[in-house]
Amino acid sequence: MPNSKTNIKAYTRQELRDTIAALGEPAYRADQIHRWLFSDWVTDFEKMKNISASLREELSRRYVIPSCSFENEAIEERSVSAPETSKFLVGLHDDEMVETVLIPSPDRHTVCVSSQVGCPLRCTFCATGYMGFTRNLLASEIVEQVLLVNERLGDRSPDNHVTNMVFMGMGEPLLNLNNVFDAIETLTNQSYNFSLSRKRITISTVGLIPQIGELARSGLSIKLAISLHAADQEKRTSLIPVAKEHTLEELRHALHEYADMVKEPVTLVYMLIEGVNDADQDAINLIRFAQGFLCKINLIDYNCIVNVKFNPVKAEKRDRFIHTLVNAGVHVTVRKSQGASIDAACGQLALQKKNKTASRPY
């Protein structure tokens, strides 16, 4: 028989306040409950010791406290001196799953979180897009990806914790803005047991212009990364079908406004794909796109996925592309892909442990 109780973690923070107020409780009571759920990570109302016994009983009657869990972990084999990337299969309360990636380095621990189960945008180079879309993640499910990774890091060393977070996992975060905003508010609450600063959080998007404006107006001042991959309209649309909804000039204008508002450079992510976007003219187009606003370019190699006939560029072609950008005075970083051997690199997340391997749906 299905459980008729409501998942209390499905509420945003404001919804929780409204719900607790409807029970005749003061507003601060909801904040106490929220702290128990997300800072102390309790799974039993009886452990909420500063909540009255009568309210604990009422909450137990109405609600459940589900938690996400690790279903599987894959660790990339690397040299002893290099930290290994780990990919976690995270089970959700309704038996759906997402993937979360931990990318360690000597001075930080970056967690790459998912924001949706699957993705509706069908980017042609991305395994997640071939899965199709199931649903948005709750704010709690985003937060718990960080909690789970923190727990795993603590097992390895008591002083370890997540220092940076990127919304670059499964899904398009700007299609789930309310839950993404709520998760960020929780994770950056300085009175909670996290050590995350908003300045260490990056949201990656394919470039949904109305939502970029909403993010700019939110006051969160989060760093923004754009999956650009081509500065030619036709080429970009062939890689990112939703790009047909707005011109590159409209996107550029939105990014210019965002950078001006948050006083942070926008990162233009450009994945080099052999014979697709690696020509001299492609480099020139990218230079032109990047002119006139605060931005930097991250070049990354294409990471191969099942049933997709793209290939990474050869080293000589990549070096020529980089040389063209540098000679034009463009700020460019060549980002080394981590996690490719365990299908945890950019574009490779596709729930393979759940037998949802990438296959073309169209």
UniProtKB/Swiss-Prot annotation:
Substrates-to-products reaction catalysed: adenosine(2503) in 23S rRNA + 2 reduced [2Fe-2S]-[ferredoxin] + 2 S-adenosyl-L-methionine = 2-methyladenosine(2503) in 23S rRNA + 5'-deoxyadenosine + L-methionine + 2 oxidized [2Fe-2S]-[ferredoxin] + S-adenosyl-L-homocysteine; adenosine(37) in tRNA + 2 reduced [2Fe-2S]-[ferredoxin] + 2 S-adenosyl-L-methionine = 2-methyladenosine(37) in tRNA + 5'-deoxyadenosine + L-methionine + 2 oxidized [2Fe-2S]-[ferredoxin] + S-adenosyl-L-homocysteine
CDD domains assigned: Radical_SAM (cd01335)
Main location: cytoplasm
Domain Radical SAM core: start-end pairs: 105-341
GO BP terms, alphabetized: rRNA base methylation; tRNA methylation
Keywords: 4Fe-4S, Cytoplasm, Disulfide bond, Iron, Iron-sulfur, Metal-binding, Methyltransferase, rRNA processing, S-adenosyl-L-methionine, Transferase, tRNA processing
UniProt-listed Enzyme Commission number(s): 2.1.1.192
Location in the cell: Cytoplasm
Top-level taxon of the source organism: Bacteria
MF GO annotations: 4 iron, 4 sulfur cluster binding; metal ion binding; rRNA (adenine(2503)-C2-)-methyltransferase activity; rRNA binding; tRNA (adenine(37)-C2)-methyltransferase activity; tRNA binding
Recorded GO CC terms: cytoplasm
Active site positions: 99 (proton acceptor), 346 (s-methylcysteine intermediate)
InterPro entries: Aldolase_TIM, Methyltransferase_A, RlmN_N, RNA_MTrfase_RlmN, rRNA_lsu_MTrfase_RlmN/Cfr, rSAM
Pfam family, one: RlmN_N
Disulfide links within the chain: 112-346
EC primary class: transferase
Entry-linked PROSITE patterns: RADICAL_SAM
Cofactor note (record): Binds 1 [4Fe-4S] cluster. The cluster is coordinated with 3 cysteines and an exchangeable S-adenosyl-L-methionine.
Cofactor or coenzyme needed: [4Fe-4S] cluster
Binding site for S-adenosyl-L-methionine: 171-172, 204, 227-229, 303
Binding residues for [4Fe-4S] cluster: 119, 123, 126
Reported function: Specifically methylates position 2 of adenine 2503 in 23S rRNA and position 2 of adenine 37 in tRNAs.
Family label: Belongs to the radical SAM superfamily. RlmN family.
Other remarks in the entry: Reaction proceeds by a ping-pong mechanism involving intermediate methylation of a conserved cysteine residue.
Protein name, UniProt field: Probable dual-specificity RNA methyltransferase RlmN
Organism in which the protein naturally occurs: Chlorobium phaeobacteroides (strain BS1)
Gene from which this protein is expressed: rlmN
